[in-house]
Amino acid sequence: MVEVIRYTCMKQVILLSILLFASPSCDAQNSTEMSNEQNSFEVAKSEQEWQKQLSAEEYYVLRQRGTERPFTGEYNMHFEEGTYNCRACSAPLFASDSKFDSHCGWPSFDGGIESGAIIEKLDKSHGMIRTEILCAKCGGHLGHVFNDGPTATGLRYCVNSLSISFDKEDE
């Protein structure tokens, strides 16, 4: 009986060790992918240049694929008429008429401002399978898109406020 328990514990320790050593290599691969992607965008800067241009929080979201806490972003409940742009490169991304309150804590849109403004990419991070959205001009991480939107498109582009800026429509 003691041998069975010892054997089971040993298997668990080995499995846990494998998982712990595999995790950093997965993160390193994602970091390498992001570095390689930078070179394929119209606006391509070094990480040092992005760090100088963006605040620490903006850099975390846009360049390191971070997420701001829900209900804390300046554009979550913002419904003025205008255009939401990429905070890193100023590319237009979303029109205000596509914005809606999804009650999720982040700004939500039912589509991009025009075809090709946003790139969708498979994201298997954090044990989930999602679709990441990136600015097509600079590759900045915007958030994720889900197929549970309440509008005719059926989509919900869930965007970090830190990844966008807003230009008010002229009256």
Language-model features and meaning:
Residues E42, Q51-N85, A91-E171:
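A short Gly-Trp-Pro
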Residues T8, L16-S17, M34:
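Composition-driven detection of intrinsically disordered, low-complexity segments
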Residues P24-S25:
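C-terminal motif of bacterial Sec signal peptides marking the signal peptidase cleavage site
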Residues T32-Q51:
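N-terminal low-complexity, Pro/Thr/Ser-rich intrinsically disordered segments
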Residues M1-V2, L142:
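Feature for soluble, non-membrane regions of globular proteins
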